């Protein structure tokens, strides 16, 4: 049995292995970031850190999610960083048996390598996503994560790091 979080995006059932998920949180409106990929909604504060939030509908289907009360943010780990995936709703944690999994035939290829496999259920087909491949090669997202990492390290700086000509800078940005 394999535990997965099943959720909806564009009314399609999608899933991620539970070990890839840090937490599921209530939807909150992200602060927009200029000049990022169209599927990056912005950032929120999560566990005292800045968390980029991705509109999964926009990433997968090219259409923005219409905001509503059932929306959630799934916090996942990608490339040693955390991302929030905005989804329409959460179906729940489901145990899938190995007989439910179906991989693609060698003759049939899925152009998008972020589809890990298909899962057959009584209510239809669930697409298991490969979170590691979902944003692979996205330069804008990589730059955003690097900028957030830099900002995180800037939080650790002390007053001594902010001097002009060896003089501390006061709160009005005037050298003393």
Named regions from a protein language model:
Residues 1-176:
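An acidic, low-aromatic, low-complexity terminal/linker signal
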């Amino acid at each position: 049995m394999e535990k997965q979080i099943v959720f909806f995006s564009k009314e399609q059932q999608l899933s991620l292995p539970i070990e890839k998920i840090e937490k599921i949180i209530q939807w909150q409106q992200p602060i927009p970031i200029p000049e990022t990929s169209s599927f990056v909604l912005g950032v929120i504060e999560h566990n005292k850190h800045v968390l980029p939030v991705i509109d999964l509908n926009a990433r997968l289907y090219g259409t923005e999610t219409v905001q509503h009360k059932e929306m959630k943010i799934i916090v996942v780990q990608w490339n040693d960083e955390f991302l929030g995936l905005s989804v329409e709703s959460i179906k729940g944690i489901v145990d899938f048996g190995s007989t439910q999994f179906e991989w693609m035939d060698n003759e049939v290829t899925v152009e998008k390598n972020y589809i890990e496999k298909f899962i057959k259920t009584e209510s239809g087909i669930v697409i298991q996503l490969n979170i590691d491949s979902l944003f692979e090669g996205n330069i804008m997202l990589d730059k955003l994560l690097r900028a957030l990492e830099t900002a995180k390290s800037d939080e650790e700086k002390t007053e001594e790091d902010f001097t002009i000509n060896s003089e501390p800078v006061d709160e009005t940005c005037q050298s003393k």
